[in-house]
Structures are given as structure tokens and as C-alpha cells.
């Protein structure tokens, strides 16, 4: 009941309007797996889901904020991030409930939306997951963590708001949504830019990990752009008119 109440009530709180600042460029740096560093025009740095020892090199990253969608070792290596960042752990101790975040850093807002890591409302061992949203410089950016829900509720959609840039897992499970479910979530959220994450690469260890690479998700999709870089610089006036999938290289 506690979960149900928070899922219904808090979404309304999270949709408080945010005054957009001047439309200036935001930099999104992809470190690999589900790990991103978002840097605002004012220099606020938000590290999202830093990975542990899964084969990717450990980069030098400094941040002001670290977000952790859930407490699995490939998403919660906060010690990798240098500086003295604020750490937003999406799940409470024991991972049986969500933590709630809605905090401003200058003109940047970072907030959380409760979700599930599975398709049975958190009752499997996979449990809970948190979506993190960054609102800055006229952009709304969402990181779905290890979402396992095949569809979002109306309350979750309201909490997310109109998403411009969406990071979504596309590795076909087994710990996240399937490829058809990922495609359905994109259609439901309707972002301007989709950045695939959490898919198999030659760097990902162990090599027997059962997921797939990004190509099955891209099959049959229109407006796919392979960036050829680990850094995307984007501003609101550069957003495409229809949804574009941007495949980034990991650093």
C-alpha cells in the first residue's frame, strides 16, 4: 500500500513546472553500459549509474551529483566518481522502498520517479528501480536505469513530463525490458532523441552475458544516427522534429 500511495501521489508533486533557462548546449558523455556524464551549460555535472568491474575501463570522472537507479554492481559504483558529489541512491537501505529526490542545483533540477526492475511490480528478486530526470537549459533528459516494466503508468508519464532525450536499455534483458518492450516504451514516452544503453559490446564482461548488442533494437527503425563519438552536445533548438535514435560510442 505504501508503494501504491507514493506511486499515485508523488508523481503529481514531481510535475511542478520548471522555468526553463536560456537554451544553451548540454553535453552528454557516454562512458559505456548505462553510465553517462551530463554536463549543463552552467557546468553542473551529473554522473548516472556508474558501472563496477564489468570489463569497461574506469575513466576519470568528476561530478557534482551521482544518480543510482538501483543497487546492482554494474550501476552503483559511486566510488568511481571523483570530487565530493551528492549521491542520489534511488533505493532505500535494503532496496525495499524508493528514495525520493527533487533538488535544484542552480537552474538545473534533478528528480526521481519510482519504477520497477521487473514486470511484476517489484515482487521478483529484481525488485525496484528508479528513473532519474534532469531538467536544464530547456531540455528534459530521462535515464530509465534497469527498467523492467513493459509499460509506464499514466502517473509515471505525467511525472516524466515531455522528455527530449531518453536513455533506455536495449540489450533484450534478461534484467531489463525486452527489445519489443523497449520499442513500446519509446513509442509511449515519445522523446525527441533516444540513446540506447545497457547492450552487449566486445568490452562487456563476462562474454557469456546473455544480452544482445544494439542492432536488434535498431532493426526496422527510422532516423537512426551513429554518432561515431562518445560525446553528444545538444541544445533545445537542435532537437529533431521526429524521434531520432542516436547510437553513441562508449569512451
Model-derived features with residue positions:
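Sec/Tat signal peptide C-region and signal peptidase I cleavage site
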Residues: 17-21
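Histidine-centered divalent metal-coordination motifs
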Residues: 65, 69-76, 80-81, 198
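Binuclear metal-ion centers of metallo-dependent hydrolases, dominated by the metallo-beta-lactamase
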Residues: 99, 189-251
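Bacterial N-terminal signal peptides
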Residues: 6-16
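Core dinuclear metal-dependent hydrolase active-site scaffold
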Residues: 22-65, 73, 86-161, 165, ...
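Positively charged n-region of N-terminal signal peptides that target proteins for export
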Residues: 1-4
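Extracytoplasmic/secreted cell-surface and envelope-processing proteins
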Residues: 76-77, 150-153, 174-180, 202-209
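Proline-aspartate-enriched helix->loop->beta-strand connector
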Residues: 63, 164-168, 179-199
Amino acid at each position: 500500500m505504501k508503494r501504491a500511495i507514493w506511486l499515485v501521489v508523488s508523481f503529481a508533486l514531481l510535475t511542478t513546472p520548471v522555468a526553463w533557462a536560456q537554451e544553451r548546449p548540454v553535453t552528454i558523455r557516454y562512458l559505456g553500459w548505462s553510465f553517462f556524464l551530463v554536463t549543463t551549460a552552467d557546468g553542473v555535472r551529473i554522473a548516472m549509474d556508474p558501472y563496477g568491474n564489468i570489463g569497461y575501463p574506469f575513466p576519470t570522472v568528476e561530478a557534482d551529483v551521482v544518480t543510482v537507479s538501483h543497487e546492482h554492481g554494474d550501476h552503483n559504483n559511486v566510488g568511481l566518481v571523483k570530487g565530493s558529489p551528492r549521491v542520489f541512491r534511488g533505493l532505500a537501505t535494503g532496496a525495499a522502498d524508493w528514495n525520493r529526490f527533487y533538488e535544484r542545483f542552480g537552474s538545473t533540477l534533478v528528480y526521481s520517479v519510482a519504477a520497477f526492475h521487473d514486470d511484476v511490480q517489484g515482487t521478483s528478486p529484481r525488485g525496484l528501480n528508479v528513473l532519474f530526470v534532469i531538467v536544464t537549459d530547456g531540455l528534459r533528459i530521462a535515464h530509465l536505469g534497469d527498467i523492467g516494466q513493459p509499460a509506464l503508468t499514466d502517473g509515471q508519464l505525467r511525472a516524466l513530463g515531455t522528455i527530449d532525450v531518453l536513455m533506455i536499455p536495449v540489450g533484450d534483458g534478461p534484467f531489463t525490458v525486452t527489445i519489443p518492450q523497449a520499442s513500446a516504451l519509446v513509442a509511449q514516452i515519445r522523446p525527441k532523441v533516444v540513446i540506447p544503453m545497457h547492450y552487449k559490446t566486445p568490452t562487456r564482461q563476462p562474454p557469456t552475458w546473455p544480452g544482445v548488442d544494439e542492432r536488434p533494437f535498431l532493426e526496422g527503425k527510422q532516423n537512426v544516427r551513429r554518432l561515431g563519438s562518445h560525446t553528444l552536445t545538444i541544445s533545445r533548438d537542435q532537437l529533431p522534429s521526429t524521434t531520432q535514435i542516436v547510437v553513441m560510442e562508449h569512451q
